Structure formats: C-alpha cells, structure tokens
C-alpha cells in the first residue's frame, strides 16, 4: 500500500506498476505524518480495505463503484460524518463513532442541499452569467475567466454542479457541438476546476472533502490532480476585515466588555483609543494635513499578479503542479504577505481581545498604526496574541486570501464596493450557508462532553448543573466559558465591526450575515444564488437588508418553499425556506423580481399555475 501511495504522490509516478503521477494532498507523506510510519498487520489492513470496497445488501456482497460515486453521495457522507463523534475505548486500543444526544446535524448548522434546488439556483444565478460570457469575442477565454465561489462550501456540491454546467458550455464552444462528447466535457471540467472555482469553510474536514470531491469529478486520464490550495481554503467567511474598514482605524466600539472582561479595563481602553484618535487629529491639523486621514492599507496587487502567473502555468504535468505549489507557498509565506495578514488580523483581534489586568496591551488605534507601518516596533507578546486570536477565531480576509479577485482601486478612483473598499469580485457566489444563531447552544455544546447536562429537563436545571462544574469539573467549566467568550466575541464583531450594517442586529442568525457577505463578494455584474430560511424576507431583523435589495433592485428572484415534502429531511416540516437570487449594481438585467410562494418541490417552479 505504501508503495502505491508513494508512487501516486511522486513527481514521476511508478512505471513498474503503471501508476501515473497524480500528486495532491491525498498521497503526500506530510498530509498524515502520524500515520506515515505507523505499523499495521496485513490482516487488519485487509479488513479495512474490504470494508471500504464491498457492501452486503440482502445477503448479497457487492463491490462499491467508486468510479461513479457523485457529489450527492459524498455530500451525504459528509453530512453523516458531521454527526459522529469519536470516542476512545477505555483501554485506548481503538475508538468508536457514535451520535451523541442532541448532536444530530446541529453542531454545524449544515444541511446537504437537494440537487434539484442546486440546479434551480444555477438556472437563475449562473446561467445568465454564462450567457454573457458566450457573447464575448473569445467565449472560451471568457468562460475560463469566470470566478465562482461558495463561502460555506462543505463537500463542494454547489461548486461541482456549477463546474459541470460550465464545462458543458466550454466544451460546446471548443467543439462546436451542442452535445459535446464525454471526453471533451471531462477535459473542460478539469480546466474549470483548476481555474474557476473558489470555496471556503471553517471545518477542516469539509475543506479536504471538497478538494477530494473536485479531484474525483475532474480526473482526466494521464493528468495529475489540479492544484487547489489557493482556491479551496480554511477559514470563517464571516470574520474578517476589508480595506475600507481598516482605513478607518480601530473604532471605539471594539472595546465593549465580553464574557470574562473587566469593565473598568474596557473603559480605559475605549478612552485611550478615543484620545489617540483626537491627538492624531490635532497633529494633522497643526501640520496642515486632513483630519481623519485614512490608514494606509497593504496593496495586494503584487499578490494578485503572482496568483495570475501561477494560474497561467501548465498543469498537465506533475512537475508543473509542484512548481505551482512551491510558488504559492513562497508567496503566502513571504514577509510582505505575512505583514498584510498580520495587520488585518490585528484589526479584527481588537474586537475580541482579553480586556483584563495583566493581559497583553490591547490593539488600540496607535498600536494598530504601528503594526500596520512597522510590526517590528510592537512588543512580541502583542504580535503573538494577535496570531493566537486569529487562529482561534479563524479570521478570513477575502482581499488577502484571493488577491486575484479583489483589488484596491487606483489612486483617485472610487472602489466598486464602497463599504468594503475594494473593486472586482466574484462573478457568481452560490451556497446553502449554515442556519444557526451566533451564540452557544448549551444543549448541543454539552452533548458530547457531559450528556447529563445536555439532557437536563429544563434550561434552568441545565444552568444549575453548569454552575456545579466549578467544583466538580473545573477543566470542563473553563472550556465552556472559553467557548462562551468566543461566541460572544464573534457576535460582538458582527454587530460592531461595521462589516454588517444591514444584518448585524437583533438575535443574529448566520444565514442573514452570510447573505449580506455573499452580496458584498460579487462584482458589479455578478450574481448571488443562496438557500436561506424565508425569514430573510419577513423577519424583523432582516427587514433593513430586504428593503435595501428591493430599493436597489438587486433582487432577481425569491422562490419560497414549505418543507412538508421533506426536501430537508433533517429539519422540521413546518420550516419555510427560499431560493434567493441577487444581482450586482451593474447587472445588465434589471427586470422586476420573480416570486413564487408555497412551493413544495423544485418542479413547482416550472408550473405555470
């Protein structure tokens, strides 16, 4: 097995066994270093391979057909894995996977999307963009230049569905046939996967499964797996900054007290931040400069050029894939790239900093300026704390992660997106983001850690049991309070960072801020296609957002569904959800929005009655 794995992961393959060089993280020896030198008896390995290769149904043993496994099946596996919690056996010789009470699909807020819903969103969000590309003088180049993103990509169902539709159009352009051959579509699919798709998820398992899913779909005989490290990324799509926000410095609202903070320390920091801003203003006035001068923001143009050069490289040979990997690691590991990320991380960290006596000095306006201009001038403990917080909260800064998509406007020019301060954006943003509140759900949190607390008959009883942990299990109590603080910090950021002026209010649900994020990620001529609860149009907390998309004629369509037919079997049948499509401010089509209500299945959308 090691010979096969090493052969597939090598640059040259293994000619003796007719194994091609596929590359990718699947066979890299450093992907699972703990297992690289582990020993296993042949009998145990055979048992594992047999379990993966065969299933028994009605007493009949059948081989698993991995060649024809689709995105839906892998998505179902992903959703099932989210429910399972590994529990090490008492003798530490193995582990079992079990579903803890209260953990069924709730720990992630994720639900696999029915393919019919995905296809419907592609009709309204992707097809119009593809149609515009087909009208270009060079439609092949135009299609390959499209950028499609899912900011909560999971196992990649939306990206794969989009890739297949784009690949067929690309193959049609290349061959001139309305129904291109499977080989031409497969070749086009590999090009689409390697050049057009972007995805982000905060679950490491999802990121890896998404890559594997894309690789399986786009495998082309004799060619290595596409390089995807710069496309499919790990991070929290909702927690990050943007050039326009950083240019304003640290707002006073950043220093509101969170769970465990000292209110007196918070007041001191808020006052210090305000005084630093006032002192700076007085100095600028004295020097004849403009008060409120924006902070300098790292220009990511150089990084964007590096990514574009990387994408232009041939990827049909394993040597080229390795060169891409080396170049990307060199760029992302460079001092300049690290400084840009550090400044963005520091801005976000100010909102969730530990504000107690004895903690490292907080990132106030002056500290942020010093980090932005010369990180070496800042005490090391502050830099270390910024990095710790950034890792804990999985900060993700879109303009730094994807510098080929977002860029700063030229001096004197206005950005396409004034709120974010950038130009550019994705052509299409798709997805079914999590539907969950940004705060700790005690029942779900304790489901895998202390089932007795999770199973308490009432919320009051549960809180009493939690308080008893102070004396009975201080370690678990500290873990809970730390996660409670993290959730409090995430909510505070969403409400007060300025990134969510429309949805950062009330009892915030992640689907609302995802909808606002997705809208800000598209270019002026881009489109959003998203699955969200129908409360996006009816809830009090989203009325400002919905009013804005109506007034600006951003809404293309809203198709409302009832779940009575179990489209989402894991949620209540009374839940209503919608397929929402929005267009950018420069969209060529500005027709009145299309509405459908009380649909039960995707086929109802085509019913004239």
For each feature predicted by the language model, list its residue ranges.
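Preference for the N-terminal adenyl/adenosyl cofactor-binding alpha/beta module
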Residues: 1-167, 200-206, 235-238, 338-450, ...
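Signature of N6-adenine DNA methyltransferases within the class I
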Residues: 1-32, 116, 160, 167, ...
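Glycine- and acidic
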Residues: 58-66, 97-113, 143-153, 191-200, ...
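Flexible phosphate/Mg2+-sensing switch loops adjacent to catalytic phosphate-binding sites
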Residues: 133-144, 166-195, 218-231
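Long, amphipathic alpha-helical stalk/connector segments used for oligomerization, subunit docking
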Residues: 269-329
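Residue-level recognition of alpha-helical structural elements
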Residues: 299, 324, 329-332, 336, ...
